[in-house]
Regions:
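Conserved, single-site charged/polar hotspot
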Residues: 1-485
C-alpha cells in the first residue's frame, strides 16, 4: 500500500479495516472498501507493516480523480524521464524536502535520479506544463498536482485534480467544442458519469490511479480546455445519468449507422443494460428491429434509414480491399489479437469443431463471411477460410481491427475519399466478393453503444436540450445530482 508522504508499506497478514462513524461507533469493514486516493483515513503500523486502517465518515468535499499518464511512444505508463515547468511558480516536494521554483525554471527528472516520491504543486491558479510531452495542442498543461514515482526502473506520472476540472479537458478531447452547447453539456454529463463509475472501480488501483488519459478510458487533455468546454461542465455541475438504481454506464461514440448497439453484442458482457438495448434510431423514436439476418441488414444499409446521423459523411461508407491486402492485414495483426484474448480467435479442428489453439496462420484466403450479427446488425463473428487453417473471429473490434488497414481508401456518403484509419470505421458492415477483391459496405463510426456524438449535436441543433438528448440515447434514465464520489 502506498501512503502519501510516506511511501510504500507492506500489509500485515492480519490487516483489518474499520469504520469510525460521526457518533464515535467503530464497525468492521472490508479491504474492498479501500479506494484509490482515500484521504479520510488513519493507519495503524507496527514492525514496518500496516496492521489496520480506520476509515472516517466522509464529510462533503470536492471529489478528486487520479489520472496516470500514458507514454504515447510505447503505449505504456513508463517514462524514461520527464521535463516540466509551470504557468506560475511551483513547489517540488521530494520526501521531506520542499523547493520552490519560478515559472520559467524547467526541471528534468530521470529514472536514474529519482529515488523517492516526488510531488509537484503549482502556486494558486497555476498549471504544470510538461515540456517532454506533445499533444495535439503542443506541450500539455495540467491543473492539480503531479505525483512522480520510480516503478520498475521507469517513471510513473499521476495527475490528481478535482473531478470537475478534469472534465474541462475531457470534453474538448472527446467532442469538437464547435458543437452545439446542449450537445457539449450532454457530453459533459456522460464524461462525469463515466469518470464516477471508474473512480468507484479498481481497474488501475494497483497503480494508484482511477483512469489513464487514453482511449482505454476517456481521452484527457489531448486538446486544450476552452470557454465552451468549461461552460458545459460548469452548467451541468454534479449531474450524472442515473439508471437501474445506480450511475449509468454512459458510453459514447462518433456516428451511428442509424442503430444503437447493446453491450452484450459488442463487448460480450454477461447481460445487457435496460438503457442500452439494441434498437433502430428513427427520428425521435427508438424502434426494435432484428437485423441479425444478412439480407435484412444489407437492405437496412441500402435504405439509409433517416436518423439524426443521416447527414454525417460517415453515416455510410465503402472500401475495397484486394485479397493480397486483406491477407497482409490479417497476418500482421492476428497474433497480437489472439494474445489479447485467445478465446475470441478459434481454429477449425479435423472433426469440424473450433478451439483456441494459437494456430492462426491462414495461408491463402479462400473465403470471408459474416456468420453472426447482433440484433442491431453489428458483426460479432466472422469465418475466414484459408489454405492452411479456417478461423472464427469474435467481437466487432477484432473484426474491425483485422479487416482494416491504413492503406484502405474509404468513399464516404459526402463522396470524399479518406484513408489512414488503422481499423474499419465500425462493426456495421457487409462483405461482398468481387473478382480478387472484397467490398466492405458499412455505416457509422465507432462502437455504436450509447450516445452518438454527431446525433447529439443534430438533436441540439433542432432545439433539444441536454436532458432530452441523454434520455433519448439512454432510454429510461434520469438526470441526478451526485453530491460526492
Amino acid at each position: 500500500l502506498q501512503i502519501e508522504n510516506y511511501g510504500f508499506v507492506s500489509l500485515d497478514a492480519e490487516f483489518c479495516v474499520y469504520h469510525l462513524k460521526s457518533d464515535g461507533i467503530v464497525t468492521p469493514g472490508e479491504v474492498s472498501e479501500l479506494s484509490v486516493g482515500e484521504s479520510e483515513a488513519k493507519y495503524v503500523a507496527a514492525s514496518g507493516k500496516i496492521c489496520a486502517v480506520l476509515l472516517y465518515e466522509r464529510a462533503e468535499k470536492t471529489a478528486k480523480i487520479r489520472v496516470i499518464l500514458q507514454n504515447e511512444k510505447n503505449h505504456s505508463y513508463d517514462f524514461p524521464n520527464v521535463c516540466f515547468s509551470a504557468t506560475t511558480g511551483y513547489t517540488v516536494v521530494a520526501g521531506k524536502k520542499k523547493t520552490h521554483f519560478d515559472a520559467s525554471k524547467k526541471q528534468k527528472l530521470t529514472a536514474q535520479n529519482v529515488t523517492e516520491h516526488i510531488v509537484v504543486i503549482p502556486d494558486t491558479g497555476g498549471k504544470i506544463r510538461v515540456e517532454s510531452v506533445n499533444k495535439q495542442y503542443g506541450h500539455p498543461e495540467y491543473r492539480g498536482i503531479f505525483e512522480i514515482d520510480l516503478v520498475d526502473k521507469a517513471l510513473h506520472i499521476i495527475n490528481e485534480l478535482p473531478l470537475e476540472e478534469y472534465l474541462y479537458s475531457v470534453v474538448p478531447s472527446e467532442m469538437p467544442t464547435e458543437y452545439q452547447k446542449e450537445a457539449l453539456k450532454a457530453q459533459a454529463v456522460c464524461a462525469r458519469s463515466y469518470a464516477i463509475k471508474q473512480m468507484a472501480g479498481k481497474r488501475l488501483a494497483a497503480l494508484g490511479a482511477h483512469v489513464d488519459d487514453s482511449v482505454a478510458f476517456q481521452v484527457y487533455n489531448n486538446l486544450r480546455e476552452d470557454a465552451a468546454s468549461i461552460a458545459a461542465v460548469n452548467e451541468t455541475k454534479g449531474q450524472v445519468v442515473f439508471a437501474e438504481n445506480q450511475v449509468a454506464e454512459t458510453y459514447f461514440y462518433s456516428v451511428s449507422a442509424g442503430v444503437s448497439a447493446g453491450i452484450k453484442e459488442v463487448w460480450f458482457a454477461k447481460k445487457d443494460r435496460s438503457y442500452l438495448m439494441p434498437c433502430v434510431l428513427l427520428g425521435d423514436s427508438r424502434k426494435t428491429l432484428d437485423l441479425q439476418k444478412e439480407a435484412d441488414f444489407s437492405k437496412f444499409l441500402k435504405d439509409e434509414t433517416k436518423s439524426y446521423d443521416a447527414n454525417s459523411p460517415w453515416y455510410r461508407w465503402r472500401t475495397t480491399v484486394s485479397e493480397k491486402q486483406l491477407q497482409q492485414f490479417i497476418s500482421e495483426k492476428i497474433k497480437s489479437r489472439y494474445e489479447k484474448n485467445p478465446t475470441q480467435i478459434q481454429t477449425k479442428q479435423k472433426d469440424g469443431t473450433f478451439f483456441s489453439t494459437g494456430q492462426t496462420e491462414l495461408g491463402e484466403i479462400k473465403k470471408v463471411e459474416i456468420l453472426k450479427r447482433g440484433k442491431s446488425g453489428v458483426a460479432v463473428m466472422a469465418q475466414i477460410t484459408g489454405s492452411k487453417n479456417t478461423l472464427r473471429i469474435y467481437t466487432e473490434y477484432n473484426l474491425r481491427n483485422l479487416f482494416g488497414g491504413e492503406k484502405l481508401i474509404y468513399l464516404r456518403k459526402d463522396k470524399k475519399e479518406v484513408s489512414g484509419l488503422s481499423c474499419l470505421p465500425s462493426g456495421y458492415f457487409t462483405i461482398e466478393k468481387k473478382g480478387d477483391s472484397y467490398i466492405f459496405t458499412g455505416g457509422g463510426y465507432g462502437h455504436g453503444v450509447g450516445m452518438s456524438q454527431n446525433g447529439a449535436n443534430q438533436m441540439a441543433a433542432q432545439g433539444k436540450k441536454c436532458e432530452e438528448i441523454l434520455k433519448f440515447y439512454f432510454s429510461g434514465s434520469i438526470l441526478q445530482y451526485q453530491k460526492s464520489v
